[in-house]
């Protein structure tokens, strides 16, 4: 299954589907599975699409492992907007229309501290390593695609065992910043868009040598009875207006 950038997708799908012709589609309900880190963007874009199209969206946000379980279990859904890891699973991949997936957004990793706390140095691999080792506690979501990369980073820095004792795991990305803001953990480590919240401040992004962007891509379920509406929503996510929202939420469109 190939992947397309948003620019290519917009050209191929045709923005006309999102404008006046979209209102010609019979109003329906779309069941969407989405990565938890897309919650900010989709919670704003979803209502915009509903008003423009008349369709009703039901969005279920979850971690990558759980999304794979839902997709492979045969549970009904119309489309996904999820980390590319979902589409690397052979059983999950088989449930999508055999067309190129469409990249919607991407985002890198960073570190946050409680507002007013000293900001540690995370500008180099050695500095990040020292900061993590010196922190009394850290928090992130281990059971997720992003969490898997955080764990990989610990391994690259040679601090996996040291991090186990001080990690306070969360089950959803939206729990990370509040935990730091309330003093339940000293550092939050995750995708930078979900680390933007009241009560916390960025210490900085991962150093370039360790940085990696997680890509969120979209695809229509092969057995969806609402494929046209699902395609219209994906096309909507590639528009300049949607890109502006995605960017405002701390992600990079496409």
Give the location of each predicted region.
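Sequence-pattern detector for short linear motifs
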Residues: 6-9, 34
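Bacterial N-terminal signal peptides
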Residues: 9-21
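Exported/periplasmic ABC-transporter solute-binding proteins
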Residues: 25-75, 81-93, 97-98, 102-107, ...
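N-terminal secretory signal peptides that target proteins for export/translocation
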Residues: 1-4
């Amino acid at each position: 299954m190939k992947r397309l950038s948003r620019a290519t997708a917009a050209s191929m799908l045709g923005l006309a589907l999102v404008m006046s012709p979209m209102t010609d589609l019979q109003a329906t309900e779309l069941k969407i599975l989405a990565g938890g880190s897309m919650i900010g963007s989709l919670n704003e874009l979803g209502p915009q699409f509903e008003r423009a199209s008349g369709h009703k969206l039901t969005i279920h946000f979850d971690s990558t492992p759980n999304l794979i379980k839902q997709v492979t279990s045969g549970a009904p859904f119309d489309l996904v907007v999820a980390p590319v890891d979902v589409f690397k699973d052979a059983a999950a991949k088989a449930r999508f229309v055999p067309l190129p997936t469409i990249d919607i957004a991407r985002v890198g990793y960073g570190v946050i501290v409680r507002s007013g706390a000293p900001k540690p140095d995370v500008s180099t691999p050695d500095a990040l390593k020292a900061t993590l080792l010196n922190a009394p506690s850290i928090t992130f979501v281990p059971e997720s695609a992003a969490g898997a990369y955080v764990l990989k980073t610990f391994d690259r820095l040679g601090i996996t065992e040291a991090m186990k004792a001080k990690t306070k795991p969360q089950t959803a990305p939206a729990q990370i910043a509040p935990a730091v803001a309330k003093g339940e953990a000293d550092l939050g480590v995750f995708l930078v868009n979900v680390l933007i919240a009241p009560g916390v401040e960025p210490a900085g992004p991962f150093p370039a040598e360790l940085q990696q962007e997680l890509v969120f891509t979209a695809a229509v379920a092969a057995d969806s009875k609402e494929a046209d509406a699902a395609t219209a929503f994906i096309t909507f996510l590639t528009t300049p207006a949607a890109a502006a929202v995605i960017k405002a939420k701390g992600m990079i469109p496409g």
